[in-house]
Amino acid sequence: LIESLGLGAFTVHTGVYEPAFPPDVGNDEVAAAAGYDIGEIAGRHDRAYATEAMSEGMEKLIPRLYEQGKFDGILSFGGSGGTSLVTPAMRALPIGVPKLMVSTMASGNVSQYVGTSDILMMPSIVDVSGLNSFSTKIFSNAVFAMAGMVSFESKQQIEHKPLVAATMFGVTTPCITRAQEYLEQRGYEVLVFHATGAGGQSMEALINGGFIKG
């Protein structure tokens, strides 16, 4: 379906057994990225161990592949195991890179999967196990959404101004708005984060990433 839209499909095998079709990146390469041997992982017959090992490999390998220009967006389908395996790799990618996770876990608390990143979570409605009339529609919608994100980039001109972070509650909105106007008049760009939920964590992630100047 991806290729029928005129896009390229770059596949990564995250399972521990033989794939259903030849992937672009084999599970041996994924495992090796974190110092594991795929034969040893498969030989244990331990789902939790395999998930953790392959997740570590994905977290290290996926950002490297992105830097090499192998893909422009990442799309994955999974249940609880697949979601916990792939989302750490998604979180390791820069903000702005399209990331879409179709998951059985998407209708609940997804903070452990999304963290401070911009992962989009889409409920799979039915289990991610084969194709049926419902899953085919959901999976197709996910492909179309990803195709749109990688095909249509924002044309807005980005001005590289020094970034200043501010946190805000509803009751402090007038104060922060006034401070924002003051700083922007002096050549700064102000990023406002909600002071509850993941807002503060997102701000700290950008600070740790070296984006924030004050």
Please annotate each region the language model reported.
Residues 107-116, 201-207:
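Glycine-rich, charge-decorated loop segments at or immediately adjacent to ligand/cofactor-binding or catalytic sites
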Residues 42-43, 109-171:
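Cap/lid and interdomain-hinge subdomains that line or gate substrate/regulatory clefts
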